[in-house]
Amino acid sequence: MTIAERLRIPAEIAVAALVAYLIGFWFTGLFPGYLPKIGGLWSAISAIVVTQATRRETTSSASLRILGSAIGAITSAVYLTLLPFHPLGMALAIFATVLLCTAVHIPSHARLAAITVIVVMVTGSLDPKLSQGLNALLRFIESCIGTGVAVLGVRLWPGSQLDSSDNT
């Protein structure tokens, strides 16, 4: 493996995280009070989680991220619409989310869905006057921003491989 090949993935991840952070920060900043730094953070985390060694692995990771984030955002939004934040309630929402993922035969999405529950519930608790539904939607969109940046970045990056058997 050449030095360029060894540096490609770290560079892809760093650039994707930066671009996703900036876009997420800007986007969430359009909604006063909804914490643009959290929007940037969540977008960057998504880009890091989704970026993989190959295009195929990145695409697969992207589908996990989007569906998992949607399930987690919906579960936490429903909980926070009915009840205020509480750590035990968060654990209950995580349990329900993982159970739902398992019940609909997508257990591989459960971890990312559970992480989304935590992020939505904790950020929502920072200012309970804000709309919990909008907070959950923003966290989902930020996840999509990071995911999109990662997929686009891997597809456009020179030397990115389609799969692990590629030599290009």
What are these regions (language model features)?
Residues 1-117, 122-168:
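Alpha-helical transmembrane segments and their membrane-interface boundaries
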